[in-house]
C-alpha cells in the first residue's frame, strides 16, 4: 500500500502533501481529503468551507490574502486543472520564519497539495490557461477580518514565475493591496 508523503516547509506547520495516486487502464484515483489520515499525520483540522476559483488565463495572480484574529484560516490548497505557483507567507510575528515566503508548484498532473496553517498569507499565480484551484478552509470567510498584501511587495520579494515583461492579471482589489513595509 502506498503512503502519503509529507514535506515540512519551514518551522511553522506549512506542509507539502503528496497523496498516494493509484493508476490503472481507466486512469487514476487518489484521496484528496481524509480526516482520519490527516489527523494521523499530525494535521488535526476540521474544515468548514470549500472554495473554488477558475482563472481563465495564464498569468492571473490572486493574493496575497489572509484573515486575522478568531477568523484566521488554515487552508488545504490543490489545483484540479492547469497549474499554479502557490505562495504562502508566514505572518506570525513570533515565528522564526516571520515574513518568509514559501513557493511550490501545484498542478492537476502532480496532485500535490499545500496545507497552510493559520497565520499565513496566501496567493497564487496561474501557469496555464483554464486553471482551477480548490481549497478547504477551517474558518468561514469574514469580510471584516480579511487583509491583503500587494503581490510585488519588496519586503517579501516573491519570485513569481511571470514571463519577462508580463504584468499579471489582477483584480482591482489585489492591485490596490497595501505593501507590508516590513510589517
Language model region names:
Residues 114, 122-127:
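Short beta-strand His + acidic residue motifs that chelate non-heme Fe in jelly-roll/DSBH
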Amino acid at each position: 500500500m502506498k503512503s502519503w508523503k509529507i514535506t515540512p516547509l519551514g518551522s511553522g506547520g506549512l506542509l507539502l502533501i503528496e497523496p498516494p495516486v493509484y493508476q490503472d487502464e481507466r486512469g487514476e484515483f487518489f484521496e484528496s481529503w481524509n480526516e482520519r489520515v490527516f489527523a494521523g499525520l499530525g494535521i488535526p483540522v476540521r474544515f468548514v468551507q470549500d472554495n473554488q476559483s477558475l482563472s481563465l488565463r495564464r498569468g492571473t495572480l490572486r493574493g496575497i490574502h489572509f484573515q486575522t484574529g478568531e477568523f484566521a484560516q488554515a487552508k488545504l490548497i490543490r489545483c484540479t486543472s492547469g497549474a499554479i505557483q502557490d505562495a504562502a507567507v508566514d505572518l506570525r510575528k513570533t515565528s522564526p520564519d516571520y515574513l518568509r515566503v514559501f513557493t511550490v508548484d501545484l498542478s492537476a498532473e502532480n496532485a500535490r497539495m499545500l496545507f497552510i496553517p493559520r497565520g499565513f498569507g496566501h496567493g497564487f499565480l496561474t501557469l496555464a490557461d483554464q486553471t482551477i484551484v480548490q481549497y478547504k478552509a477551517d474558518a468561514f470567510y469574514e469580510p471584516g477580518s480579511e487583509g491583503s498584501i500587494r503581490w510585488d511587495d519588496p519586503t517579501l520579494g516573491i519570485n513569481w514565475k511571470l514571463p519577462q515583461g508580463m504584468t499579471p492579471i489582477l483584480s482591482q482589489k489585489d492591485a490596490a493591496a497595501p505593501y507590508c513595509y516590513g510589517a
